[in-house]
């Protein structure tokens, strides 16, 4: 019976700040999690999703019997790409009526499909590069990490399976059928199942995995390339190194540097209240890894002090707090790899040049050195009365556009836009060098909603002075808010929250008859 049904694997990818272009619903008297309202030209349409499809798996995890809120959360936490296994509506209803085990429905077909797939050519016929391996840090809850280990006949290595929905492994970014490359920094590609189980058991309450998903593993196999651990994605780790830029005050930087008796390297101590070090976000017990882009892990105390002095009136430190240091030590990864990864917007921590004026209206004061102030914002605007509630301005002869005349209580105000905000991206496309008319056209052609990456004037001047590219990953992620496609635009309890809490990446609507979420 199961062989008569043909589930489809749909892979969706989107840009930062955009949505997938579909609604995920549950409906009264209807089984399953339904795909609805697929937007024309959206990632959902391009991936082959159809109206009425039922979602069986998300990133390999079976979700048909899960609560709708958990299914929505799985999609949201997938970031900018997600793989859905779906079954068309008619087939789903027949399968349910005939009591077909939906969990087993796709197994043989998925394996056959995977074996048949070949890597597609990229631009100009070039082979697409393989994705990165990734580090996942798991801290046990109760007595479980929320996964099982398996071997596959005819394949080398150990794989992760039975990923528990909302369990430790899933929250850490583990996917079903991930190939296990390292356990706590030790390669296990040639280890037996029993040896890997022993290493996991001996890890105690926390463990670090270097993993490769099945698509990436197949890509490397077909291209006959090997994994490079130094290229691993670090973005899933809960604690990261920090880049701290400090400008010397009249009394110096305002901290002491000491050799830690139990900690390798030099650590920050006795930060003075109100000092430049405190304002820049430096913390007591931070471990110094690099100074002005150069590693100091092998230097003694005097060597690190000299490196800081050479910075003159400003220095840039790469530091780790105790949690981040513990995680990177467990993985046996150098924190300097963080600077080389795509997750760090500026890519390096070299000493910045002298401040230069921003292309837009120059400010009369130095940019603040408060690290928390140096963040762009992602703002998702839902049009009301055919207006977004702000004006777009530019200075003749200069690149860039900025926000003016934000209407109080309007869509722009609700989304967190402020006067003088500089427009960096429109729907994921960088527009800093685009002419004013082109930026206006992009916003107008967005339809009912638009996602803007913006930066306040002071923060913009800071990034320009440091030659730091402004990208969406630097901003706080968009959070769920009121329904963008609901039947009414009346204010809800969300409207009492601060502006940044109202910015939207997804929208939801619920009633006694249905519950749906725009993805």
Swiss-Prot record:
GO terms for biological process: in utero embryonic development; positive regulation of protein targeting to membrane; protein localization to plasma membrane; regulation of monoatomic anion transport. Residues 482-503 have a biased composition (Basic and acidic residues). Residues 348-374, 479-519 are annotated as: Disordered. It comes from the Eukaryota. Residues 505-519 have a biased composition (Low complexity). The modification Phosphothreonine is found at residues 451, 488, 503. It is found in: Membrane; Cell membrane. Residues 9-90, 128-215, 243-323, 378-458 form the PDZ domain. Expressed in kidney, liver, small intestine. brain, lung, and testis (at protein level). Keywords: Cell membrane, Membrane, Phosphoprotein, Repeat. Pfam families: PDZ. A scaffold protein that connects plasma membrane proteins and regulatory components, regulating their surface expression in epithelial cells apical domains. May be involved in the coordination of a diverse range of regulatory processes for ion transport and second messenger cascades. In complex with NHERF1, may cluster proteins that are functionally dependent in a mutual fashion and modulate the trafficking and the activity of the associated membrane proteins. May play a role in the cellular mechanisms associated with multidrug resistance through its interaction with ABCC2 and PDZK1IP1. The PDZ 2 and 3 domains seem to be involved in the interaction with SLC26A3. Disruption of the gene was not associated with abnormal growth and development or redistribution of interacting proteins. However, a modulation of expression of selective ion channels in the kidney, as well as increased serum cholesterol levels were observed. Belongs to the NHER family. PANTHER family: NA(+)_H(+) EXCHANGE REGULATORY COFACTOR NHE-RF3-RELATED, PDZ DOMAIN CONTAINING PROTEIN. This is Na(+)/H(+) exchange regulatory cofactor NHE-RF3. It comes from Mus musculus (Mouse).
